[in-house]
C-alpha cells in the first residue's frame, strides 16, 4: 500500500535533498507539516518507531537544507529518529515497507542509501564515527562537513564522552546536534535563547572570540580572566559549561521545532572551525496528541489508524516472557529485600514497570550504560545483595569485558535475565539476539540456562537466585510465552541436568530453549527421541552420553548462532568422551539475520517444525 503524494504538494517536490535545497526557505514550515503528516500515515500502515521521528521533522529538514548531503556526512545516533531522513532521501514511496521482510531497513543502513553514511542501531556510536569522518575530511581538504545527531538519552553512555573528549583534543571541524526531547538537561528554551544561539554562532561573535584569544595568548592571566568571564556570562543563560570543558563550542538551547531558526543557526555553525555542539529542545511525538501525551507508549507502535487517536487494542495472548520475568522479580522482591532489579534504560521492554513502582528502593535504572550496569551489579553482589540485571541479548554484548572481568572472574552471584534471545524480527541485524550463548559459553564460572517455556523460565530464575557459586544467565526470547499454566511453587533445578521429553529411535534431538515445540513436531514426524537440555553450560554429561550411545544421530537445535553455540558444546563434549558419531547442528547460520516477522524468519531459516524435520531428512539422505 502506498500513500497519495498529491495530498502533500510541497513534500512531492522534495524527494531528495537536492530537490529540497531548490525550495525557497519560506515553504519549509509547510514542508515540515506535510512531512510529519506523511510520517504519521506511513507508520500507521507499516508499524515502527514513531514518536522519535515526529520530534525530529524540522531538524531533518533544516540539516538537509543547509548541508550538502551526501557529500557532507550526516550520522544519526541509534536511528529511531531517522524516519523523516529516509523520507527525504529517496525512500518516501517505500516507507510503508519499513521493518518488513524485503522492505527498507528500520535504521540508517549504508547498503541501502548513500545518504546513510554510517549503519546504526545501538546508541552512542555517532560521535566516534563522526570524529573519524571529520579527521578524514581534513586530510582530504575537500571542504566536507560532518554532523552527528544524538539524543539526550544516548548522552548517558560512556562511549559518547570518550568520543567528545577525543574530539575536543583533536579539534577537527565537526558538529554534534544534541536532540534533547526529555528536558533532562535544560528547560531554558525560548525566544531569548534562540536569539542568543544565532548571535553566538554568528560571524561577528566568533571573529571577536577567536581574535581575542590570539591577542590574549601572550597574556595568560588576562586571558584566563576573560575566559572565566565568558563562561560566567554564558553559564547564566546556557547549560553548556560541561561541553565547553570537553573542548566543544556550545550553542543553544534553541527550539528544535522552529525550522527557520534552525536553518539560520546551522548556516552560521556550518562555517565555524573546531568541534561544535548545538543543543536543541524538541518534543517527542510532536504533532500527534496521543504520542505527545505518552511518548514512551508511542515510541514504537504496531499498525494503527491515525484518525482514531488510539493504538489497536492488544489481542488476547499469553503473557510475554518479559512479563513472566517481571512478575517473578516482584514475587522475589516481596520476600527478600536483598533482591535488586537493574536495567540499562529498558524498564518497559524488560517488564520492570510494576517492579519499579512497587519496589523503588530496590530498582536501579543505570541509563544507556551497559558496562556500568554490569559492574554495578557486581558491586552489589560483593555486598551480599542479589542483583538481577535485565538486559537484551544484543546489549549485553556491550558489557562483555565487565561480564568477564568484574563478574565471572570473581565468581559473583549476579543473575543475568537475558531478554530478546534469538530472533527479534523487525528491528533486524543490530538487534537479533544471535550470539549470547556463544559469547557466554567461553567464560569460566558461568551457568547458562535456556528455558523452553514460561514455567521453566520462572524456575530457572529461581535457580539463579539460589545459586551462590557464580553468575547465572537465563536466556529467553521476545514475545509471547507458550501458554503453560503457571506453577506457583518455585523449585531450584539441579545444575546441569536436562530431561527426556519423548523416547524414540535412532535419532535424538537435543533442544536448547523455546524451539522445543518446533523440535517436538520434528521428533513426532521422525519418531525421534527429544531431550529438553535446559542447561547450555554445564551440559548434562550423563544425558549426552546416554543419548550418544543409544542413537545413530544426534541433532542439536537452538535459536543461536551455530558457531560456538550450544551445539558446539555438545560436539566438544563428545570429543572429550571419545564418542565419535554423526551430529547435526541446527541453529542460526554464519550471517547477520535481516529484518522481518519472527515467524517468517524462522521458517526461512528452517527453524520451525517442518524446517527442522526437513534439515534432518536432508542430512540423512546425503
From Swiss-Prot:
Pathway: Metabolic intermediate biosynthesis; 1-deoxy-D-xylulose 5-phosphate biosynthesis; 1-deoxy-D-xylulose 5-phosphate from D-glyceraldehyde 3-phosphate and pyruvate: step 1/1
Reaction(s) the record says it catalyses: D-glyceraldehyde 3-phosphate + pyruvate + H(+) = 1-deoxy-D-xylulose 5-phosphate + CO2
InterPro entries (alphabetical): Dxylulose-5-P_synthase, THDP-binding, Transketo_C/PFOR_II, Transketolase-like_Pyr-bd, Transketolase_BS, Transketolase_C, Transketolase_CS
Annotated thiamine diphosphate binding sites: 80, 121-123, 153-154, 181, 288, 370
Residues that hold Mg(2+) according to the record: 152, 181
Cofactor: Mg(2+); thiamine diphosphate
Transmembrane segments: none
GO molecular-function terms, A-Z: 1-deoxy-D-xylulose-5-phosphate synthase activity; magnesium ion binding; thiamine pyrophosphate binding
Pfam families linked: DXP_synthase_N, Transket_pyr, Transketolase_C
CDD domains found in the cross-reference section: TPP_DXS, TPP_PYR_DXS_TK_like
Protein's GO biological process: 1-deoxy-D-xylulose 5-phosphate biosynthetic process; isopentenyl diphosphate biosynthetic process, methylerythritol 4-phosphate pathway; terpenoid biosynthetic process; thiamine biosynthetic process
EC number per UniProt: 2.2.1.7
Gene Ontology cellular component terms for the protein in this record: cytosol
Domain of life of the native organism: Bacteria
Oligomeric form and interacting partners: Homodimer.
Family named by the database record: Belongs to the transketolase family. DXPS subfamily.
Full protein name: 1-deoxy-D-xylulose-5-phosphate synthase
Source organism per UniProt: Shewanella loihica (strain ATCC BAA-1088 / PV-4)
Gene, per the UniProt record: dxs
